[in-house]
């Protein structure tokens, strides 16, 4: 089975959802995930496919999924549930369900999604894995899903309700119990036939030709690693680093003589153990070593290159710098009284001593998150204190955060000696890296076992960072809306307004907005370091159909994804991107649309992004196909996707708040 645990959105910054999802917005989440999974799996042999579980199409909870410690989820109706998540109900209106939580699933279904996992919790009062409206009504009938549904960890409380509600596999029944239920009429034979057809058809579709379909009774460990994957993982990790601050063009580092390395996140946990799956217990706000993944159900990395490992390799390779390190977040800041006399006088190792003696100080901190429990805080006081302690004595403090979602930074981001900042966040059980350099800052995501190399590649300018934030970093935790619901009726009162949509609607100034990220330029010479610059121009809107006589509703026959005309291309929006700097770099152009007032929609919504690599002086054109779906809202009165006639705003920019070119568009419906 190919499966990929996606896509998850969450309305609360501390919830586990950010550890298991890709972003805080629904745009094309699944489309890109499916393309990546397909690219990964296609070259595999049938033997490899039979022996390896890749996780592609089975996602962690269809629609609202936020269960864990304090839960906003879906379950319980007067029954005695052992699992706390099953006592909790995610209650939300139909428009929010469709425009936020269902949206990325539509991409998955449209791209041939094979299987879906139903959630443990309740949705609007009904257990997710027994919910006929969610599984049959919306997923199978409304979106045209042709695959099968599996349960999350625990079987439904009512086995028959699960089968009748759409659950096709592992309902909790034995074969003999199912046969008896069919025989006595409590489960119609037609229901079981449909489930069987969906399972077999999906397997044959993914593992054709059918006569070669591998069905091993016993499986053995099989090495499917491609030696070249190491380089890919390293490059993907470094290109996923988000640079958030780079004061005085601190990065890339140019022939440094001495580095100070601080923080437990700089090295692997010396005594072990390696991370273990633990779904039940809160594991703390931070991890006691270099964090490369969120906790939970995942395949462990075969090895981990920490930042200290990577720096050691670079120093040993004749790079001309030395380093000292303190691999602790709470080491002595100032020296104790001196002992000894003359040449033998010493005052002991301290943070202040190593910071003073270092040309640049690298501070590594992290924020941990895991499946089975929510995060307790958005900032770690010990880590914040370490940053300030180092920055008090080091004029060039570079902060690298490996974190499982949002991590507040206002305790130190304005410190005059913090020159660089980067941020890494675990997504899909992976970690993002944010870098802040005092004077600068980057963020990194998903470098896994090559994490240390990926970070160091950016620090020394081997790779120009070009990634963008996939969530908003606020100035205060109080700026976020949505609160963890302990139990049991959890109302999604924020509706459509999560993350940047909330900040825009409420007029709140973030510290770093959704989509933000810096880059620097380096031509490989040690004395070159500056921002590369990009310009956006020539924004054009080309209708693909008559936009003055549009039908308001999508009414086509149901295909995979929904009504066929929902995917009709209405417009093509294009623009030119130019590199006006002196060296090569990459820009992520982001397209946002605003809807007419009558739509009562968020201020702006992401509807496209494109990453382009440009040589100095080069210009490339980007284009964004806009479907009917991109211009529609969910009409709760008719239960249909609807285009609201009126003026639409079209903006292209570098983030959700930094716009470079704007246009307006008027759509008329009949």
UniProtKB/Swiss-Prot annotation:
- Sorted alphabetically, which keywords does the UniProt record give? Carbohydrate metabolism, Cellulose degradation, Glycoprotein, Glycosidase, Hydrolase, Polysaccharide degradation, Secreted, Signal
Q: Which reaction does it catalyse?
A: Hydrolysis of terminal, non-reducing beta-D-glucosyl residues with release of beta-D-glucose
Specify one Pfam family: Fn3-like
- Coiled coil ranges: none
SUPFAM superfamilies the record matches? (Trans)glycosidases (SSF51445), Beta-D-glucan exohydrolase, C-terminal domain (SSF52279)
Class of the enzyme per the UniProt entry, highest EC level: hydrolase
Q: List, in alphabetical order, the GO biological process terms annotated in this UniProt record.
A: cellulose catabolic process; glucan catabolic process
Pathway assignment reads: Glycan metabolism; cellulose degradation
Please name the catalytic residues of this protein.
152
Disordered: annotated span: 65-87
Q: Report the glycosylation sites.
A: 51, 141, 184, 248, 330, 417
Signal peptide (from-to): 1-21
InterPro entries assigned: Cellulose_deg_GH3, Fn3-like, Glyco_hydro_3_C, Glyco_hydro_3_C_sf, Glyco_hydro_3_N_sf, Glycoside_hydrolase_SF, Ig-like_fold
Record EC number: 3.2.1.21
Location comes to: Secreted
Transmembrane stretches, start-end: none
A GO cellular component term found in this entry reads:
extracellular region
Instruction: Report the PANTHER family cross-referenced here.
Output: BETA-GLUCOSIDASE, BETA-GLUCOSIDASE M-RELATED
Q: Which family does it belong to?
A: Belongs to the glycosyl hydrolase 3 family.
Q: What does this protein do?
A: Beta-glucosidases are one of a number of cellulolytic enzymes involved in the degradation of cellulosic biomass. Catalyzes the last step releasing glucose from the inhibitory cellobiose.
The name on file for this protein is Probable beta-glucosidase N
Per the UniProt record, the source organism is Emericella nidulans (strain FGSC A4 / ATCC 38163 / CBS 112.46 / NRRL 194 / M139)
Lineage per the UniProt record: Eukaryota, Fungi, Dikarya, Ascomycota, Pezizomycotina
- Gene encoding this polypeptide? bglN
């Amino acid at each position: 089975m190919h499966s990929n645990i996606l896509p998850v959105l969450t309305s609360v910054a501390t919830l586990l959802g950010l550890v298991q999802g890709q972003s805080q917005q629904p745009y094309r989440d699944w489309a890109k995930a499916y393309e990546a999974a397909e690219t990964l799996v296609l070259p595999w042999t049938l033997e490899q496919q039979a022996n390896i579980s890749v996780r592609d199409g089975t996602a962690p909870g269809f629609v609202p999924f936020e269960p864990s410690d304090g839960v906003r989820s879906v379950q319980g109706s007067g029954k005695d549930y052992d699992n706390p998540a099953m006592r909790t109900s995610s209650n939300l209106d139909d428009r929010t369900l469709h425009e936020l939580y269902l949206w990325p699933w539509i991409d998955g279904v449209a791209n041939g999604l094979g299987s879906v996992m139903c959630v443990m919790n309740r949705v609007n009062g009904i257990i997710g894995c027994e919910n006929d409206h969610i599984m049959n009504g919306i997923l199978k009938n409304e979106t045209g899903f042709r695959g099968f549904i599996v349960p999350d960890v625990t079987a439904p409380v009512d086995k028959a309700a699960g089968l009748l509600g759409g659950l096709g596999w592992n309902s909790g029944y034995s074969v003999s119990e199912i046969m008896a239920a069919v025989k006595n009429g409590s489960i119609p034979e037609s229901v079981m036939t449909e489930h069987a057809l969906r399972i077999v058809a999906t397997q044959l579709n993914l593992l054709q030709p059918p006569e070669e379909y591998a069905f091993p009774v016993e499986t053995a460990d099989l090495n499917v690693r491609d030696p070249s994957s190491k380089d890919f993982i390293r490059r993907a990790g470094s290109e996923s680093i988000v640079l958030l601050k780079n004061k005085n063009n601190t990065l890339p580092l140019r022939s440094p003589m001495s580095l100070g390395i601080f923080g437990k996140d700089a090295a692997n946990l010396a005594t072990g153990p390696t991370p273990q799956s633990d779904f039940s217990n809160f594991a703390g706000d931070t991890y006691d070593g270099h964090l490369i993944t969120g906790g939970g159900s995942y395949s462990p990395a075969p090895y981990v290159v920490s930042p200290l490992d990577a720096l050691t390799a670079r120093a040993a390779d004749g790079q001309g710098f030395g380093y000292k390190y303190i691999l602790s977040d709470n080491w002595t800041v100032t020296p104790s009284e001196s002992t000894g006399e003359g040449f033998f006088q010493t005052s002991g190792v301290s943070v202040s001593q190593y910071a003073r003696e270092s040309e640049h100080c690298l501070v590594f901190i992290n924020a941990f998150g895991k499946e089975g429990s929510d995060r307790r805080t958005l900032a770690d006081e010990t880590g914040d204190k370490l940053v300030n302690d180092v920055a008090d004595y080091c004029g060039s403090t570079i902060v690298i955060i490996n974190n499982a979602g949002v991590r507040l930074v206002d305790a130190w981001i304005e410190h005059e000696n913090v020159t660089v900042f980067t941020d890494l966040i675990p997504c899909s059980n992976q970690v993002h890296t944010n870098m802040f350099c005092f004077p600068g800052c980057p963020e990194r995501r998903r470098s896994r076992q090559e994490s240390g190399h990926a970070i160091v590649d950016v620090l020394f300018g081997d790779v120009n960072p070009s990634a963008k934030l996939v969530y908003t970093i606020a100035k205060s935790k109080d700026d976020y809306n949505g609160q963890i619901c302990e139990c049991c009726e959890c109302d999604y009162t924020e509706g459509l307004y999560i993350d940047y949509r909330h900040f825009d609607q409420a007029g709140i100034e973030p510290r770093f907005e959704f989509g933000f990220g810096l880059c620097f330029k380096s031509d490989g010479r040690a004395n070159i370091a500056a921002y590369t610059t990009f310009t956006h121009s020539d924004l054009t809107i080309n209708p693909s159909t008559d936009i003055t006589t549009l039908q308001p509703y999508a009414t086509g026959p149901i295909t995979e994804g929904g009504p066929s005309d929902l995917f009709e291309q209405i417009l093509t929006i294009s623009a030119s991107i130019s590199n006006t700097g002196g060296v090569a770099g990459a820009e992520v152009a982001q397209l946002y649309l605003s809807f007419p007032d009558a739509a009562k929609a968020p201020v702006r919504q992401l509807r496209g992004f494109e990453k382009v690599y440009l040589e100095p002086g080069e210009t490339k054109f980007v284009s964004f196909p806009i479907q009917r779906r991109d211009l529609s809202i969910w009409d709760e009165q008719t239960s249909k996707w609807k285009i609201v006639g009126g003026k639409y705003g079209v903006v292209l920019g570098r983030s959700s708040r930094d716009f470079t070119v704007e246009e307006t568009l008027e759509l008329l419906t009949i």
